[in-house]
Amino acid sequence: MVEQGDAAPLLRWAEGPAVSLPQAPQPQAGGWGRGGGGGARPAAEPPRRREPEEPAAPEVLLQPGRLELGDVEEDQVVAVFVVTFDPRSGNMVEWCLPQDIDLEGVEFKSMASGSHKIQSDFIYFRKGPFFGLACFANMPVESELERGARMKSVGILSPSYTLLYRYMHFLENQVRHQLEMPGHYSHLAAFYEDKKGVLHAGPGRGSSLPPVYWLPSIHRYMYPEMKITHPAGCMSQFIKFFGEQILILWKFALLRKRILIFSPPPVGVVCYRVYCCCCLANVSLPGIGGTIPESKPFFYVNVADIESLEVEVSYVACTTEKIFEEKRELYDVYVDNQNVKTHHDHLQPLLKINSADREKYRRLNEQRQMLLYSQEVEEDYNPCEEDLFVLFFLEQNNRIFQTLLEVSASQDKTLTAEHARGMGLDPQGDRSFLLDLLEAYGIDVMLVIDNPCCP
């Protein structure tokens, strides 16, 4: 039985250079709003001291096999917004900049269903070509109009999710400020002016942006850097929560299946599971992945996303809405707590843990223990556990595809049980997985591993 891992506290983010806000130049903040009027006064908290920014390592998002170190990701914010829950109207966008940005659906993405039961949360989500991060807070108030509770989210949109963590602390402070002083947006307006990105002009500006590539490349450029503090990293919690079942998720992620993770609020830690699931499928060999759809981290989704999910052939997402379980046409794999299941008959064999899976899990834990030992005894924190986790699966995936490419280039194109063992797979237990893998990636080899004989 896999150990329940949600007792651990929410992950703490390691802050990079402090977000520096210019002084609000005028008392009346710009932006569009429907509620909480009145001139903006300075925020309750004092302005944060501007600290010198240290040169950061380049963080890039690349297609597999395309490592271009000059492509440094820009630190851009394309929108900032405040969402509130109105007892009469429901979720609504209270204020935003820029005024003409399309935020349809963001009022539901940034305030997860069921959030009224918790005090605070953070949510990653996807909105068209952009990624969003919102911080939610729930404050009791003595107001019959608000039915005893005031709930708001403050969030931002960016072309990529890898830099959103930098603003977590700022958003947490601002949502508390909005709860205590509704309608005062001067710090948010100043923040947007300081960080705003330039959108492409034209009616279809969102769709004209280049596609977002999340698949990493090699070593330090190999995965989106989320800088989670040691030792409460998302990878270690992911392994602790799912145990050996991460090998089941690994196979489904490598096959680019539609993976939907259900969990009641808070949803922040579940967004980390989406990220970790995506990290299982990295491949850095050239020529791999050209015929298979891009695997997309959608992070949090709700019923408002059903129409967009209907046309997706591959994604990883999470939700707090149980209704999704009934909509089987939207997903291939459904994860409820630690229960991984699929309604597709041909995928059922992939749900079984085999001897090769157990061996991989043993090696992963062995490497983790060696890393922890070196960190504690030798005080060597490079690489970190996140590096180890991603490298482990990257090397496993590269070994599989390197073998498959070599066999496909051979004269007889025959893939044997010996090849399977050399790839770290179980010839019998992973036969179905191998067949699906060959079909998904369009690799021309002949599998000569027979089905196990019936007794």
Curated annotation (Swiss-Prot):
Residue numbers of Omega-N-methylarginine PTMs: 41
Region annotated Disordered, chain positions: 1-61
Spans traversing the lipid bilayer: none
GO cellular component annotations of the record: cytoplasm
Modified residues (N-acetylvaline): 2
Function according to Swiss-Prot or TrEMBL: Probable guanine nucleotide exchange factor (GEF). May promote the exchange of GDP to GTP, converting inactive GDP-bound small GTPases into their active GTP-bound form. May play a role in neuritogenesis, as well as in neuronal recovery and/or restructuring in the hippocampus following transient cerebral ischemia.
Protein name: DENN domain-containing protein 11
Source organism per UniProt: Homo sapiens (Human)
Gene name of the encoded protein: DENND11
